[in-house]
């Protein structure tokens, strides 16, 4: 029975027993901060077990996606360890109990999937006579096949708990140990656990006593992959049809054979398991990052990439495997099938990023371990582990795994200290930035009622500060902070800059440069006395720069529209990671895994402008946080909210919690234009945009530019693009002609270099120092040289390209590759002599070095490497 058929058979069987079949829940727990990822079938159903939520049915069955990474280092080294797996389960919430659970488990195993009854064994809790009798008297399980084990009791601290009963499959004495009393519960591989039935019937009290539960529950779990291995007669889960096609695809890519080399098999299993894991995680919305679930994903993905390198795979290989994973799991898991392209884009982006630093990081680590070994040390310093993490993207667990393969451990405390030091530096930098404007002690204002009202135009001065000093009077030229009783100025927050304007008193004027808020909420104004003086107690006029505020309102509302448009075009994984709203432009940082394409940018810009043209009135209201959540409001990055929140809604398009300035109608934004998009960190992108007059001015600038180009190209503006294509085509044709001339020159050079051909055994080998101005020329020479050898042999060419640069290219014909020669090894040996490195495919590789003077020595080293391979 195929794995997908087994899943379907299980779910259909329990549907026939009155269970509601639910699709697998996401791997991301919903409203459960105690869990990082779902690791068991019952985990997403916990609210039903605890009574917090009423289940849609008192009988439920699922095939739940699960993720466990506690034993990551064992994955690939044992028959059963996985990160990702599916847990088949049937559950009862105060409905049926022990007898039915046991009867149905036995019926499914023996009648539906037809396992041999004589090879099934069960264990029960010693005091659970009801379970024992049900197995023996009702199901007919022989007493010799029932074992009482103290371990068969499920509990985690106080709360619901109860005995459980495990079902085992006897794999045969050849899998067992020498103990004549070997039975279920033994540590050997003979008895394989395939199903666990948990009978939740007690409540453990604080004093350690157990009281019967009023409503008893059933929680069962059977690993799909494990059950499939039994049905398909496989030695390990990895050989089932749920996983083995991924191993086959990986082996083909690496040019290796499964089940020939134990170390190779470990890497093949690791990659197969991890390909399933990253597919499931990303399809559920997890993206690579350096914390939380994102770190789990990054750690698994990069571990897979590293094992690909151990197999000799160069370049991208994990991304194509996603197609194989989807072919297997897609029919049974909708989310995986629906997100195939999205998953591949995320994996390719992360794979490319790690490949850029992997080789350097591995070299550094191996060199470091060599040095430590020479010094008789056995611990990799924490500072070096941190360097690999910070500079080369090595999760510390990956460094630990590589180190352990060579008999080393890592200094965990030193690594944590280095991490803490980096965080402290970042925190101090933030504190320094925040402390640029000092304010005096304002505790004397604690009994004052300070208000904010944008309609107010007059108030009184409560406090003046200069640095940390409180002033009674500030004179012309003083840079000060001012607190008034009621202010119409908006404080900086939510990414929006603070208001500017003037505070005008009877004796002078203060120009307000910015408005901020102290941690406890008091609004203060930062400014300079530009006329006369100002004193505490003065009655003052408050003049906000309303034109500037209106410009920020346009940009702030446009930011909300942009956020919503990003989610609609790129996906719901997009979240705000920072923002800046100024009068002149807006900046928006968001989580996304790859550069946004021009087509996507065009869609985003068009969506925002469509909302502007709809002239929609904004709905702005205060409400409870629960009400806001019910409306689907998005909370913004870095903001903290009280019980009552302000909700800004563009009906039908965007709902966010926000305290900033906004237009009353989207039409007031006038126009929206994207100006840039770029990455600013791992998994974080930045968009900048303009609105209103600035957007219109930019459009005018573009029009004038096109008109000038039309003049230069001697055409009219509407035909500029067509004419430009003509000019570029002509230039391309000229370049092709020049390239043909260059190739003819190279062909002549190729004829010269094979004059130095030597035979290593029956293999023709050419190593030559040539003149070339680019790596493309070197590749051409190598190609032509191999052609001159009648397509059989090895060509290694090198060229100095400046005082401190030398490049190499190696080509190996397929028949010589079959003899064990790999271009990557040959070119690497050459480049290392010249102070460099490189690699590539078995048939073609290139490398670079820093010491052109050693070119001839390097070519000789390449020949020596080939000789050692062939002999």
Q: Model-predicted segments: where are they?
A:
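A glycine- and charged-residue-rich anion-binding loop/surface
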Residues: 1-871
